[in-house]
């Protein structure tokens, strides 16, 4: 194994190191009237969500996996007063603060927080207007008057516990993503600082995509099938143009991959990412949501003579995967056993969104009983976690984790 700080050349190699984010006060800033704006369907109960997340982290540690936390890595990246000040200014610039007085007050509030991790967690939680000095009526501008009912000076980032999406580890490199919605795109700022300034990761990891790009891509659509083959999803959250940029960079930087399988499927919230409908759980086994199979289009992409070569694959998906992975046969394990009711219910509760921590060893939500039973019948060992509150954000174990190091397979 190389000493490189990022080592992810598969979806199934034994997981050695992973990054999570423990849900924080950002969840307590979710309001019913603004759920759609913040990409949520419901409001998790923070205390129970934290208990569930702590149990998830402990289950990983029990398997010998080192657990890192986004909030700690980001705090450790603020290695000088100058970098700390720069972080605050970038955070303010990206927060869409419309009037100067509010921005000045927030800057003062943030500079008053001396502990780096407390500062990072405050930027994640968002800032309510009531935390700031009252602006006198005669000093209010039109924006203040028009938006007087909106409670936040800066929106919270409640999706942060889905660490899979703001950036993706690919081989020894990282795709620092430009995300689908403004409310999530601000999350990528933490990855920028980690991979630029962190004592271990800063300046040591190639970027194969950058958050300054103007087209969208998210980590839930980026899967590392093997040291030679990637899978990417063309989805609600990821543009085909972004995939082309990513692939050109991967091939030009010689990250090590020879081919990409691009999956085009239904563009809607319930199938927001490829990993909500398709994950790899063993050398020759994948979970899949049966509802995507009819409309699925797969394209093979290679890089020849300084340009991308794209071929639409017309054959059977299992045969295509077997051919590209060098195995005799691939088993597609259908969420809900293919039963239309069970499949729809369990896919909504992330029955297809599994985290493989070693070949045939998979972390799942315990609530998806039909799918879990079928996975066990295929010989997989399941590590079942509770997710009654975590699942309200529409993400499962893979969504909640970003591998930093896996053993080679």
From Swiss-Prot:
The keyword Hydrolase applies. Keywords: Arginine metabolism, Cytoplasm, Hydrolase. It holds the Pfam family ADI. It is found in: Cytoplasm. InterPro entries: Arg_deiminase (IPR003876). The active site is at 399 (amidino-cysteine intermediate). GO terms for biological process: arginine catabolic process to ornithine; arginine deiminase pathway. Pathway: Amino-acid degradation; L-arginine degradation via ADI pathway; carbamoyl phosphate from L-arginine: step 1/2. Its EC number is 3.5.3.6. One of its GO terms (cellular component) is cytoplasm. It is an enzyme of class 3 (hydrolase). This is Arginine deiminase. It comes from Streptococcus pneumoniae serotype 4 (strain ATCC BAA-334 / TIGR4). The gene is arcA.
